[in-house]
Swiss-Prot record:
One Pfam family from the record: Parvo_NS1
SUPFAM superfamilies the UniProt entry points to: P-loop containing nucleoside triphosphate hydrolases (SSF52540)
GO BP annotation list: viral genome replication
InterPro entries named in the record: P-loop_NTPase, Parvovirus_NS1_helicase
Stored Gene3D superfamilies: P-loop containing nucleotide triphosphate hydrolases
Protein name from the UniProt record: Uncharacterized protein ORF2
Originating organism: Fowl adenovirus A serotype 1 (strain CELO / Phelps)
């Protein structure tokens, strides 16, 4: 490897480590470095090429867990004040169990590849789901209205974000494969000849809803419970039923602090639908 190539890939890996995947993030994290490469006339060091390789290699070399934990372990007092810790206690969950499940899920080590957070806005459920999702530099927003492949618009993602919406009955087979964390190969529709198939590698799925998202929508528009058991078997459920003071919100920093604490305080996770 030449000296220039080595410098290029050192830069790419440094940006991966910092979770930088866009021009805006790069300017915010290190404006001087961004301006240097933005103005550089050096061949091969164009910003768009650098960020392209960052995204490609991040998907292969990192998991959501790499960006979901702070570097230092919080103090006991900090944990007791953590909104996520308080939210789980308020709803009767053992924070150590939920934390361990989230760590395994985000690191591709869990038996279930989907975490479903259910509750009203007053319970804090949507704020918790969003805080977990946006710990990731690469979030794939699932189009649940797409009846053939809801994940079609999520090519480079560390987490699939399913924000409400029922699974359509006509694509429930594909959806269950992704929810289970299977490697899925999809022949592109409308293409002929020796075209490569689209692939979906294991990517954690994070869902939020108020209603029972394990119901599937039929072509008639009605809801069916035919696949509810199969869908639940792919998921860990965190159901939040108690009103929670979300005046301060739940931030990505709160999630990272909680996960850092959970690394040092593992709990026993039962292979049941609900994490209680």
């Amino acid at each position: 490897m030449s000296r220039e190539s080595e410098r290029y890939w050192t830069l790419v890996h440094a940006l991966i480590d910092r979770g930088v995947v866009s021009r805006e993030q790069w300017q915010m994290v290190d404006p001087a470095q961004y301006q240097f490469y933005h103005r550089s006339k050096q061949r091969g060091f164009k910003v768009r090429h650098i960020l392209r390789d960052v995204i490609r290699h991040m998907c292969w070399s990192r998991t959501l867990l790499d960006y979901m934990s702070s570097a230092s372990t919080p103090s006991p007092d900090d944990v007791l004040r953590n909104p996520l810790y308080q939210l789980l206690l308020c709803n009767g969950y053992n924070p150590a169990v939920v934390g361990t499940a989230l760590i395994r899920w985000a690191g591709h080590q869990s038996n279930r590849n989907t975490v479903w957070i259910r509750g009203t806005p007053m319970s804090g459920a949507p704020y918790l789901a969003q805080a977990i999702a946006y710990c990731s530099p690469l979030v794939g927003s699932v189009d649940w209205r797409n009846k053939s492949n809801p994940f079609e618009g999520c090519p480079d993602s560390l987490v699939f974000w399913w924000d409400g919406g029922y699974v359509y009955d006509c694509c429930v087979g594909l959806v269950k494969q992704v929810f289970r964390g299977e490697h899925v190969i999809l022949p592109p529709e409308g293409l002929r000849g020796p075209n490569p198939c689209s692939e979906l590698f294991r990517t954690p799925v994070l869902m939020y809803s108020q209603a029972d998202i394990c119901m599937t929508r039929l072509r008639s528009g009605e809801l069916s419970a035919e696949h509810a058991v199969g869908l639940r078997d792919c998921m860990y459920l965190i159901r939040l039923t108690e009103d929670f003071d979300c005046a301060g919100g739940i931030s990505c920093a709160d999630v990272k602090q909680f996960v850092a604490w959970s690394r040092e305080h593992p709990g026993e996770v039962r292979e049941t639908h609900e994490l209680k």
